[in-house]
């Protein structure tokens, strides 16, 4: 009998994978984000109008939005003199089974990323280096937070109006221009529903967990134009909403002010939430399950959803 998939290992290796490792050892909805003023910007430089929306799979605790979390997802948005920076992370849910808050690691990783953008010399041209430095900061703490998460970072360097990205796992991003997808990130997975992930494992069981390196994040670079849309999201969006449906909502944007972007982002999140609870909808997740010969009756995948939506703008003359 085929039943809906409730839990799939996103976290632990199989016994065979553990053996191979041993052999290879030696080898609720958010309000919009208001960008704080920064010195050093030229009034003619491109900038991003950015909003954040999200929805927890189920209520976690009061005030989680203010804590930059939606369930086990986390996010950050920062503006520096040279760049606009944003990121999302999805805490791997398998940690719940061993009594660990699966979202805490994601939150701490995003906090480190946000803090690293304020360091001297940060110019936004290498989000992968930002991810590497942030993960090192996290792991070098006296008492590191145990857990793992995916990560997707994007920066827009203002002077050259260029988007730089680093993506590890199955969160991701889209660049949309004139109603069409200019670029979409590619998932990195070990197996079905088992993404690449940054991990701080328990000391006594390191060999049992996937421990991918931030250097494995895929980096891309894209020249942007005024009017382009940049979207970052966790897999709660991409697993439930087909690209065509997402584009239909995004293409309904007539204006690019914060209020308009916020309404658009709300529509996307609410539609993804609706589809995640639809047991008959042939979601992207259901299609992937079938491609991997995984028993799954179809329908959406209930999950936390986090979305950052940004529009490239320039000051009018």
From Swiss-Prot:
<keyword id="KW-0464">Manganese</keyword>
<feature type="binding site">
    <location>
        <position position="90"/>
    </location>
    <ligand>
        <name>Mn(2+) 2</name>
    </ligand>
</feature>
<dbReference type="GO" id="GO:0046872">
    <property type="term" value="F:metal ion binding"/>
</dbReference>
<feature type="binding site">
    <location>
        <position position="235"/>
    </location>
    <ligand>
        <name>Mn(2+) 2</name>
    </ligand>
</feature>
<dbReference type="GO" id="GO:0004722">
    <property type="term" value="F:protein serine/threonine phosphatase activity"/>
</dbReference>
<keyword id="KW-0460">Magnesium</keyword>
<protein>
    <recommendedName>
        <fullName>Protein phosphatase PTC7 homolog fig</fullName>
        <ecNumber>3.1.3.16</ecNumber>
    </recommendedName>
</protein>
<feature type="binding site">
    <location>
        <position position="90"/>
    </location>
    <ligand>
        <name>Mn(2+) 1</name>
    </ligand>
</feature>
<dbReference type="InterPro" id="IPR036457">
    <property type="entry name" value="PPM-type-like_dom_sf"/>
</dbReference>
<dbReference type="InterPro" id="IPR001932">
    <property type="entry name" value="PPM-type_phosphatase-like_dom"/>
</dbReference>
<dbReference type="Pfam" id="PF07228">
    <property type="entry name" value="SpoIIE"/>
</dbReference>
<feature type="domain" description="PPM-type phosphatase">
    <location>
        <begin position="46"/>
        <end position="312"/>
    </location>
</feature>
<comment type="similarity">
    <text>Belongs to the PP2C family.</text>
</comment>
<keyword id="KW-0479">Metal-binding</keyword>
<keyword id="KW-0378">Hydrolase</keyword>
<keyword id="KW-0904">Protein phosphatase</keyword>
<feature type="binding site">
    <location>
        <position position="91"/>
    </location>
    <ligand>
        <name>Mn(2+) 1</name>
    </ligand>
</feature>
<dbReference type="InterPro" id="IPR039123">
    <property type="entry name" value="PPTC7"/>
</dbReference>
<dbReference type="GO" id="GO:0005739">
    <property type="term" value="C:mitochondrion"/>
</dbReference>
<dbReference type="GO" id="GO:0016311">
    <property type="term" value="P:dephosphorylation"/>
</dbReference>
């Amino acid at each position: 009998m085929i039943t809906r998939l409730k839990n799939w290992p996103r976290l632990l290796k199989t016994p065979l994978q553990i053996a191979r490792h041993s052999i290879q050892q030696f080898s609720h909805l958010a309000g919009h984000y208001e960008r704080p003023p920064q010195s050093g910007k030229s009034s003619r430089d491109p900038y991003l109008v950015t909003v954040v929306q999200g929805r927890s799979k189920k209520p976690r605790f009061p005030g989680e939005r203010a804590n930059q979390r939606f369930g086990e997802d986390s996010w950050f948005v920062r503006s520096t003199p040279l760049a606009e920076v944003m990121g999302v992370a999805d805490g791997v849910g398998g940690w719940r089974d061993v009594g660990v808050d699966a979202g805490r690691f994601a939150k701490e990783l995003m906090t480190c990323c946000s803090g690293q953008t304020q360091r001297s010399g940060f110019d936004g041209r290498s989000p992968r280096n930002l991810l590497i430095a942030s993960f090192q900061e996290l792991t070098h703490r006296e008492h590191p937070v145990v857990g793992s998460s995916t990560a997707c970072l994007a920066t827009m360097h203002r002077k050259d109006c260029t988007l730089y990205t680093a993506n590890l796992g199955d969160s991701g991003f889209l660049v949309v221009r004139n109603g069409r997808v200019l670029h979409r990130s590619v998932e990195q997975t070990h197996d079905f529903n088992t993404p690449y992930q940054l991990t701080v494992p328990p000391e006594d069981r390191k060999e049992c967990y996937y421990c991918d390196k931030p250097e494995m994040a895929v980096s891309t670079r894209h020249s942007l134009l005024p009017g382009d849309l940049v979207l970052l999201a966790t897999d709660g969006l991409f697993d439930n909403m087909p690209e065509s449906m997402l584009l239909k909502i995004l293409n309904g944007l007539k204006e690019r002010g914060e209020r308009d972007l916020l309404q658009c982002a709300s529509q996307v999140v609410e539609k993804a939430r609706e589809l995640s609870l639809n047991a008959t909808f042939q979601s992207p997740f259901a299609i992937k399950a079938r491609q991997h010969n995984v028993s799954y009756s179809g329908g959406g995948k209930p999950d936390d959803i986090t979305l950052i939506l940004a529009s490239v703008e320039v000051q009018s003359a």
